[in-house]
Swiss-Prot record:
Keywords: Acetylation, Chlorophyll, Chloroplast, Chromophore, Manganese, Membrane, Metal-binding, Phosphoprotein, Photosynthesis, Photosystem II, Plastid, Thylakoid, Transmembrane, Transmembrane helix
Organism placement in taxonomy: Eukaryota, Viridiplantae, Streptophyta, Embryophyta, Tracheophyta
Gene that specifies this protein: psbC
Alphabetized Pfam families for the sequence: PSII
Family per record: Belongs to the PsbB/PsbC family. PsbC subfamily.
Main location: plastid
Subcellular location: Plastid, Chloroplast thylakoid membrane
Organism of this sequence: Gossypium hirsutum
Protein name per the record: Photosystem II CP43 reaction center protein
Residue intervals passing through the bilayer: 69-93, 134-155, 178-200, 255-275, 291-312, 447-471
Amino acid sequence: MKTLYSLRRFYPVETLFNGTLALAGRDQETTGFAWWAGNARLINLSGKLLGAHVAHAGLIVFWAGAMNLFEVAHFVPEKPMYEQGLILLPHLATLGWGVGPGGEVIDTFPYFVSGVLHLISSAVLGFGGIYHALLGPETLEESFPFFGYVWKDRNKMTTILGIHLILLGIGAFLLVFKALYFGGVYDTWAPGGGDVRKITNLTLSPSVIFGYLLKSPFGGEGWIVSVDDLEDIIGGHVWLGSICIFGGIWHILTKPFAWARRALVWSGEAYLSYSLGALSVFGFIACCFVWFNNTAYPSEFYGPTGPEASQAQAFTFLVRDQRLGANVGSAQGPTGLGKYLMRSPTGEVIFGGETMRFWDLRAPWLEPLRGPNGLDLSRLKKDIQPWQERRSAEYMTHAPLGSLNSVGGVATEINAVNYVSPRSWLATSHFVLGFFLFVGHLWHAGRARAAAAGFEKGIDRDFEPVLSMTPLN
């Protein structure tokens, strides 16, 4: 039997609010949803829903382009990016555009091009969104069956899933191609303090790549966030892109197995909840990555990580006091532990003092001073280079402290410089967004499961507490 496409609603859902209010000719009586239910009015209008999604993409890309150009217009090449409140230019610089040795910006034109390309793209998407929302067919099933769908059609849904996976895989390979063939990417570990280089010797060993997933998430291990060389990052994208593309082909060619048909809820709201759950995980992982990882997010552009700034302070004062004659190998601190250097529980030589808790930091300016057993005393006495001193002094004074209202510095310091690290911004915003996406996942999953079980009726307004309360006036 052919499914009827014209059924506006086949969900046992009532959203009782204000039936008299009509919006754009779609009132609650005909759609079953009040104006504030957003795209729920479009659940079975595939053409209009396409318009909403394309327009949303246009808004996202417009923000990217406009913000990109705003950052270019305000950029001062003499100051580090992280001192200028930039969040987009550091991403472009990390991809190797416009920067040279040490992360110095040598050309801002690629950044301008990026902004203009995004603005032009957003105009195309905006036009498409308005067209499909206002002028195009309400439903695609009749005129364009390839793009049409019914939410309950499990085979079509997995085909759409497959197409999305292939697009994600292509996205992963774009980074691979940039790193291999199109000028390379910025490597903060390049000798002498970072440079743009092509990544030639990819890590493709599955034991290495998937070993990250099996690592502990705690200190010294750090799960996938502990990745600290670009060969592993780009090799991981080869694996990820391949898995996404092959998984996409698999989902296009196959129908869901019986266990999947039984286990999952097959409705528009269920798919929304799955997507929100996935985005929530992305948000939390991005939060950890930008906060702790200084390879994927080089400190030259994003500022130092918290542990990095702390270790930089210990290093800076070790250098100063050593010049003033202190024996940094044996000086005792106020607690009886080493003042500058001490041993970790497993025997490595680490920086002493409060920064001991950040013993597992790895940073390009510090690693040359390590030996087989942690920090090497003879290297600390003879091998410290001026660029390492400059880098650590700079990072010491740019710790990622500060709050979302842009009040920078240590909370107890009355004269703090008003500096907020992009790491603070990006980590906090992605954590908060990840959290709200998770709440949305729970909300829509609960509604979708209830609707599938047949007992979702919206809120019962007959016995609402407010009805028995005294009117405000």
